[in-house]
Amino acid sequence: MENLQNYIDKLNKLNFKEMYEGDFFLTWEKTDDELEAVFTIADALRYMREHNISTKIFESGLGISLFRDNSTRTRFSFASACNLLGLEVQDLDEGKSQVAHGETVRETANMISFMADVIGIRDDMYIGKGNAYMHEVVDAVTQGYKDGILEQKPTLVNLQCDIDHPTQC
């Protein structure tokens, strides 16, 4: 594509409005238009960066990363994406948090969400656990938002779970 307007024109032809304020759990839950929009936006961001056009959509904010398994590519890709959009990354180390002392998923999820715009989770160690855990986190922050505890509900991005790895599809 030659210019940014071409990406905008392409996006205007796609139906991806349901993704707004939504989470990204599983690749196969997305429509063809939604997946095409993800790739088109990625291409547009790449174009903007290559042409020295700011990609920052946040003046400040946090991207929380939670890696329950070792990671190199996914960890640095998430950090790079957050930085590209204007977010600071804070890694949640469960061993150094109150989770280690029995704090519940609901308590932890709501606490880290006070200033978070996005939460990226990689939990792929045990079959039947990772995706379920991600849904538990989203359910907790959704309820926190509905109850007025949270000013906003952060978006959850599945960085890899036991059944999908959308960031490397």
Model regions: which residues?
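Positively charged, low-complexity intrinsically disordered leader regions
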Residues: E2-F76, S80
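Phosphate/diphosphate ligand-binding glycine-rich loop within oxidoreductases
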Residues: K56-C169
